[in-house]
């Protein structure tokens, strides 16, 4: 195998594909670069087919901190549990690739994306789909390719779309749209947006489809060059689970029974009826037939259920729960659901129920991110939990799974555009959405529940956000767009298209599509139908809580911000943090200082006011004419130093400590005495001169002492040594007895 490398320019960016040098024992491997960002994508396919009734695909993103020149945090100092970004990247790679494999493929497939270089300029996530696509192509894996993924941004100043924007370009973009698919087919969409219109979103998707085609063509060119160097790629045959005609005929004879079993609005009741029917159908096969067709019978039963559900929708216009295509399930909304917490909301739509709970904290309680991205942290966090009881099942509880992380991220992106700026609302914000019941669209219920919790907690969001999940059925040449899909319609349908937004526009999108016949006209219809559904749901929410509460809960921390001159930051912090720790210990408030001098003070009760007052005193510069009651902290022969404010001392000169002449400051003042003073001068170096208010009379002096009345005071004569005594000591070189050397002048 000979190394092949090809570099090309697309949409103002440089890309490189390489293969033939690294990971040669994998089924396929490809190195892909954007700028200096370098990713290695590998694929391994098991030699034996597994006895599964599903496609066993696993995608891992191997985030290496050395790619960004960093050492991992933590005690072990090595990579461990995947970060949230790594999990989301793995999902991004998985979603466009999974539907590209043929039905019945049961060999295990493992795709691993490894970060080798993260140049902090070009994002590393979307290019992995191209790398995985090329690895599968070169490894002769059976899939519908080539595939690509692109990110589309939009410059807020010019309105121009940008393909795969840099981190800097993303900062100036009101759209973050990720599209995955082939040259003529979009299978995955993930987006966050600053309330943009449906028309603008559709235009961005069309532009992205053109970019997908360009990147797929670049892959074809690389493969052609590879074959010129290494010879033609020979197609491999993998066994597929194929339906047995006899099994299908016998099972599909029960079509009417399946259609009847599916007609039930209650999820658990419907599942019970369908499973009972499947068992009765399975019992019609002999033990020998069941053993021979162990894999074929479950597949055929699933196809029967799918066919009955889909045909019902396209032929009658009625869904399994009796709703019309654009009808939304009954909605129940409650705010202020839990006492004492900082905010809460309960949102129920049909048999999907989510309780969202708000927690507020200091900004330094936000999440710090230890990733290879330049992003250091985030202030708003949304966490989505999907316990087994929400579907009436048993199971293990533990760390969040990939699906929970993905759904939580979607609801997080949905609310980000409407959150207040941290200068307006200086809090770290966490919302946890607990799924109490689930029958589809739980992520959209989490979005609605998060809005309720934020408004209930007094977070001044710009506009409330609602969300809806749209579906698609394409059967027998007919197309039906479904609003507010439930679990069965998601599982057996062709599309899961989630849309969130406000009255002003879209804030987030997520789509997984299996229908090759999806057109932009259908997408436009789905977006418009989603807009109408979002408005209906939003009104139900506003009927309960029309606007955010004007104040936060009494149980929430109170946070205020003050501005400190940057040259005073060290005064507030103190040596080794001594001053700021003292403020926090003595007041009970939390203090967080930013590099620009913004200080956030948080706490409960009077602790915030006390801490703010302490900080103001530290940064205050005394002005001439201001009066203080200070404490004497030091006495010198020339005067006393009086502490006016924390870290601010002024000099009370000896001539100003009392009326009349004072020989020694200690005769009038002692360390620790309180004294009323007035500032008379602050020089250019910040030195403060004081005068004493209500000066006392200077103490009377003993007889013979000078009181400044003109009398001469007699010095006590000290015994004088004879010169001979002084001359006895040895003279040092250059010693002139303390006298300056006499200068000799030449006579003129």
Give, region by region, the residue ranges found by the protein language model:
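Conserved phosphate/anionic-ligand binding catalytic regions in large, soluble enzymes, centered on
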Residues: 28-30, 122-140, 335-358, 439-459, ...
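Long, charged amphipathic helices and adjacent flexible linkers at domain junctions
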Residues: 233-242, 536-562, 608-629
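Flexible, glycine/charged-enriched surface loops at secondary-structure junctions
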Residues: 103-109, 144-146, 215-234, 289-297, ...
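Extended amphipathic alpha-helical scaffolds
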Residues: 1-46, 51, 234-373, 557-571, ...
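Glycine-rich, flexible beta-strand/loop modules in the N-terminal catalytic cores of phosphate-handling
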Residues: 26-110, 115, 119-122, 183, ...
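Single-stranded RNA-binding regions, centering on S1/OB-family and related RNA-binding modules
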Residues: 557-559, 566-748
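Mobile "lid/hinge" segments at catalytic clefts and subdomain interfaces of large enzymes
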Residues: 140-264, 454-550
């Amino acid at each position: 195998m000979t190394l092949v490398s090809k570099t090309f320019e697309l949409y103002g960016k440089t890309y490189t594909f390489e293969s033939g040098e690294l990971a040669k024992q994998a089924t396929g491997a490809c190195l892909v670069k954007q700028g200096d960002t370098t990713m290695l994508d590998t694929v391994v396919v098991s030699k034996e087919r597994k006895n599964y009734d599903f496609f066993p695909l696993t995608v891992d993103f191997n985030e290496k901190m050395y790619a960004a020149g960093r050492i991992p945090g933590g005690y072990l100092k090595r990579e461990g549990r995947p970060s949230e970004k790594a999990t989301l990247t793995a999902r991004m790679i998985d979603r466009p690739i999974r539907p590209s494999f043929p039905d019945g493929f049961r060999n295990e497939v493992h795709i691993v994306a490894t970060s080798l270089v993260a140049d902090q300029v070009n994002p590393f996530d979307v290019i992995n789909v191209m790398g995985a696509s090329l690895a599968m192509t070169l490894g002769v894996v059976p899939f519908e390719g080539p595939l690509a993924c692109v990110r589309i941004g939009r410059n807020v100043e010019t309105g121009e779309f940008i393909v795969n924007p840099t981190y800097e370009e993303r900062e100036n973009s009101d759209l973050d749209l990720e599209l995955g698919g082939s040259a003529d087919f979009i299978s995955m969409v993930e987006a966050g947006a600053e309330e943009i219109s449906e028309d603008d979103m559709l235009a961005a998707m069309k532009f992205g489809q053109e970019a997908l085609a360009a990147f797929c063509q670049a892959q074809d060119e690389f493969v052609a060059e590879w074959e010129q160097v290494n010879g033609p790629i020979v197609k491999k045959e993998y066994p597929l689970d194929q339906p047995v005609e006899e099994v299908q005929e016998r099972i599909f004879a029960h079509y009417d029974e399946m259609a009847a079993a599916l007609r039930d609005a209650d999820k658990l009741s419907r599942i019970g009826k369908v499973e009972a029917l499947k068992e009765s159908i399975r019992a019609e096969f002999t033990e020998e037939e069941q053993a021979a067709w162990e894999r074929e019978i479950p597949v055929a039963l699933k196809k029967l259920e799918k066919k009955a559900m889909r045909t019902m929708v396209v032929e009658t216009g009625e869904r399994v729960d009796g709703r019309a295509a654009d009808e939304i399930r009954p909605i129940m909304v409650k705010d202020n659901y839990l006492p004492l917490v900082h905010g809460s909301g309960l949102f129920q739509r049909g048999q999907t129920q989510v309780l969202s709970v708000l927690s507020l904290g200091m900004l330094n309680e936000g999440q710090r991110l230890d990733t290879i991205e330049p992003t250091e942290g985030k202030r708003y966090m949304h966490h989505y939990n999907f316990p087994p009881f929400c579907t009436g099942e048993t199971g293990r509880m533990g760390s969040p799974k990939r699906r929970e992380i993905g759904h939580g991220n979607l609801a997080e992106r949905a609310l980000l555009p409407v959150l207040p700026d941290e200068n307006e609302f200086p809090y770290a914000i966490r919302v946890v959405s607990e799924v109490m019941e689930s029958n589809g669209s739980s992520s959209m219920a989490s979005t609605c529940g998060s809005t309720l919790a934020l408004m209930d907690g007094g977070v001044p969001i710009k506009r409330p956000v609602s969300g809806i999940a749209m579906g698609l059925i394409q059967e027998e040449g007919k197309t039906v767009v479904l609003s507010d899909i439930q679990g069965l319609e998601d599982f057996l349908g062709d599309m899961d298209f989630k849309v969130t937004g406000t009255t002003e526009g879209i804030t987030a999108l997520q789509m997984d599509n299996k229908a090759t016949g999806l057109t932009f006209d259908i997408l436009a219809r789905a977006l418009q139908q989603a807009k109408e559904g979002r408005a209906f749901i939003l009104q139900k929410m506003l009927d309960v809580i029309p606007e955010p509460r004007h104040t936060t809960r009494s149980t929430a921390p109170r946070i205020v911000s003050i501005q400190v001159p940057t040259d005073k930051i060290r005064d507030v912090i103190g040596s080794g943090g001594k001053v700021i720790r003292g403020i926090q210990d003595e007041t009970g408030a939390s203090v967080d200082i930013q590099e620009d001098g913004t200080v956030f003070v948080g706490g409960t009760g009077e602790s915030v006011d006390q801490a703010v007052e302490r900080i103001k005193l530290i940064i205050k510069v005394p002005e001439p004419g201001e009066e203080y009651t200070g404490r004497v902290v030091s006495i010198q022969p020339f005067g006393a130093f009086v502490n006016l404010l924390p870290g601010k001392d002024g000099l009370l000169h000896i001539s100003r400590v009392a009326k009349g002449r004072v020989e020694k400051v200690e005769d009038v003042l002692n360390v620790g005495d309180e004294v009323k003073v007035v500032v008379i001068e602050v020089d250019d170096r910040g030195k403060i001169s004081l005068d004493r208010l209500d000066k006392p009379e200077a103490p009377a002096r003993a007889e013979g002492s000078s009181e400044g009345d003109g009398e001469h005071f007699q010095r006590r004569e000290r015994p004088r040594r004879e010169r001979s005594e002084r001359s006895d000591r040895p003279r040092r070189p250059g010693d002139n007895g303390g006298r300056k050397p006499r200068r000799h002048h030449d006579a003129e």
